[in-house]
Design a protein with these regions (language model features):
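Conserved short strand/loop->alpha-helix "switch" segment adjacent to the catalytic nucleotide/phosphoryl-transfer site
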Residues: 29-51, 110-112
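Short helix-loop "hinge" at the ATP-lid/N-box region of the Bergerat-fold HATPase_c
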Residues: 57-61
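Glycine-rich/acidic phosphate-handling loop/turn and adjacent ATP-lid/helix
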Residues: 79-114
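Glycine-rich ATP-binding loops of the HATPase_c
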Residues: 126-131
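Glycine-rich phosphate-binding loop
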Residues: 110-125
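A conserved short beta-strand within the histidine kinase catalytic ATPase domain
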Residues: 67-76
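Conserved polar catalytic motif of the HATPase_c/GHKL fold
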Residues: 52-56, 123
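Glycine-rich nucleotide-binding loop
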Residues: 95, 134-141, 145-147
Length: 151
């Protein structure tokens, strides 16, 4: 991972883990993607990945109960000159252990309902990191910008 040398833009928000708040996070994701110069289709995919992670936190982390989620979106410039859009999520749901053992590969031709969220997130993002904390979880999703984006 290249060290970050500058933060070009940053948005932070705290939301309840409820379906009413998903639109807030989608809007933040799309706004940051537009500020980064992403093409609309790619920005929409990125917002969908953010939506999917939030849905997973609500459904699996908080099991539909009350909770909160902190999200920070940054547009960073690495020391190597590459720009990337980073989304960091922090929840206070029970810790998820062994995330590295979950199968995030595409499922082939047989598609079953459910279980595709992490596959989608990994397909859209260049980096997906999970950290189990004492009192919750931290997720870091990053996507590198193409040279033509934001030029």
């Amino acid at each position: 991972m290249s060290p970050v040398t500058a933060c070009e833009a940053k948005i932070s928000c705290n939301v309840d883990a409820c379906s009413d708040c998903v639109h807030v996070l989608q809007s933040v994701a799309e706004l940051m993607a537009i500020r980064a110069g992403m093409e609309p289709v790619r920005a929409n995919r990125l917002a969908l990945a953010v939506d999917e992670l939030f849905a997973n936190i609500m459904r699996h982390g908080y099991a539909g109960g009350l909770g909160r989620v902190e999200m920070e979106a940054t547009l960073d410039l690495n020391a190597d000159g590459r720009r990337k859009l980073v989304f960091t999520f922090r929840d206070y749901a029970p810790c998820i252990e062994n995330m590295d053992r979950l199968d995030t590969r595409p499922r082939g031709e047989t598609i079953r309902p459910g279980g595709l969220g992490l596959c989608l997130i990994h397909a859209v993002m260049d980096e997906v990191h999970h950290e189990a904390l004492e009192d919750g979880n931290r997720w870091r999703l990053a996507v590198y910008l193409h040279e033509r984006e934001g030029a």
